[in-house]
């Protein structure tokens, strides 16, 4: 790995490298911005090809979490953690307990939980070493599976798109192309079928597709499976990416026949400039870090004490935030990416006048779990 310089982390407050030879833990924790409160972000476990690749990922993701926290109006800043390893064979309870010790050493400047390659059960182990864990199973005081709330937030985003483009938030008989049927994507596709929409789907797992096709018989909507490559070119109203990031790029934009892009995947645009490219093609883009903020809202809300009704109320407000950004972009003749980023930066600047970063010596008033 090349030497880490301050230039690489110039936008971040703190980057922590975690190494425990006894358990094999190699992890990086990045804290981007704590203006709003302590950093919050999931921990993913992936077999990165190099430490450099892991660092690039955690820096990018932690910055995205700052924007997501601001847009979701939660009292947290942006952070992220990555564990270098194959989740299929490198996981042990001891590894996650070691990770929990490193989180504890930050003394409340960073809260974490599940992400790609990790599960709530993994963080039950980390919770034995630190209280700064969110997204725990219900039996441990958490709100349970956050994918339910994330999918609910995506549905609110799709309704906001529909209202802005077609003057109604009713999704019946609209056509959607859902890419990825993971924990969130499956629930979104099922929700659309319940609404009476027509849904194209693709996923790497044929069994998951078959499961959705079987469920579709119960609902008024219709589902049709297509290949991973064909999903970009189907005749749909909205493209709904719910898998990997970077899938909106020069090549795929040319193939899209939709009026909007709105989905759960993180970092959907390969580059920010692709927001302008979508705008030039009259394709409305719903910024992903707002659309998929339901899960964040749920796990952050745990610190007030679990309350599912309150979580749904907060998540429902994503509709209004997105609609405001759509209107702002139209009025200013800018892309929705630019409008959303302006929205976030303005809110951060207002809060920065009150406090510039979070210190555990001045704990937030909402902290109820110690």
UniProtKB/Swiss-Prot annotation:
Active site: 80
Positions bound to NAD(+): 44, 115, 146, 150, 180-186, 203-204, 243-244, 264-266
UniProt temperature dependence: Thermostable. Has a melting point (Tm) of 85.5 degrees Celsius.
E.C. number: 1.4.1.20
CDD domains cross-referenced by the UniProt entry: NAD_bind_Leu_Phe_Val_DH
Pathway(s) of this molecule: Amino-acid biosynthesis; L-phenylalanine biosynthesis; L-phenylalanine from phenylpyruvate (PDH route): step 1/1
Biological-process GO terms, alphabetical: L-phenylalanine biosynthetic process
Tagged with keyword Oxidoreductase: yes
A single GO molecular function term of this UniProt record: phenylalanine dehydrogenase activity
EC class (word): oxidoreductase
Keywords, in A-Z order: NAD, Nucleotide-binding, Oxidoreductase
Biotechnological and industrial applications of this entry: This enzyme has been engineered to lead to an amine dehydrogenase able to catalyze the direct asymmetric reductive amination of ketones using ammonia as the sole amino donor. This reaction is a highly desirable transformation for the synthesis of chiral amine intermediates, particularly for the pharmaceuticals industry.
Keyword Acetylation set for record: no
Positions of L-phenylalanine binding: 68, 114-115, 266
Catalytic reaction(s) noted: L-phenylalanine + NAD(+) + H2O = 3-phenylpyruvate + NH4(+) + NADH + H(+)
Primary role: Catalyzes the reversible NAD(+)-dependent oxidative deamination of L-phenylalanine to phenylpyruvate.
Similarity comment text for this entry: Belongs to the Glu/Leu/Phe/Val dehydrogenases family.
Record-given protein name: Phenylalanine dehydrogenase
Species lineage: Bacteria, Bacillati, Bacillota, Bacilli, Bacillales
